[in-house]
């Protein structure tokens, strides 16, 4: 099985929950002795603090320049590259992934407790209309 991981959080110098989770995931998979290949998709050179086995490959996928670079990478460049690599499954570990993901994808969602416990303010008319449009658009999509 060929596994892809959106590992850009691990390649960033800033510490935090996404980086810790992604590095832990990579380290855990690296410790397994199995026949699986792993592709780590990063947006800059990545040198982990632990050795990567031979069946791991780091792939730099950049999104471009400017404010839209992260969105373009996530929505267009990364799904395209993951299909080119012939992955069996792609894991997006940081709360977001492409609208049209690869055929087999896993998305990890973190920190839902505050969302579930916090009372939501009433939606404005514009918000309700946008939700209805968005849901109607998605319900008519064919994949």
Which residues does each predicted region cover?
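Carbohydrate transferase catalytic cores enriched for Leloir-type hexosyltransferases
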Residues: 1-143
């Amino acid at each position: 099985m060929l596994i892809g991981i959106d590992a850009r959080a691990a390649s960033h110098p800033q510490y935090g929950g996404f980086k810790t989770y992604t590095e832990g995931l990579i380290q855990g998979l690296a410790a397994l002795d199995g026949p699986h290949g792993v592709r780590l998709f990063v947006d800059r050179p990545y040198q982990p603090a632990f050795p990567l086995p031979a069946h791991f490959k780091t792939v730099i996928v950049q999104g471009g320049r400017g404010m839209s670079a992260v969105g373009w990478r996530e929505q267009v460049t990364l799904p395209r590259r993951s299909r080119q690599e012939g992955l069996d499954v792609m894991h997006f570990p940081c709360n977001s992934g492409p609208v049209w993901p690869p055929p087999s994808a896993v998305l990890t969602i973190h920190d839902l407790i505050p969302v579930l416990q916090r009372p939501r303010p009433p939606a404005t008319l514009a918000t309700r209309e946008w939700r209805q449009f968005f849901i109607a658009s998605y319900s008519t999509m064919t994949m």
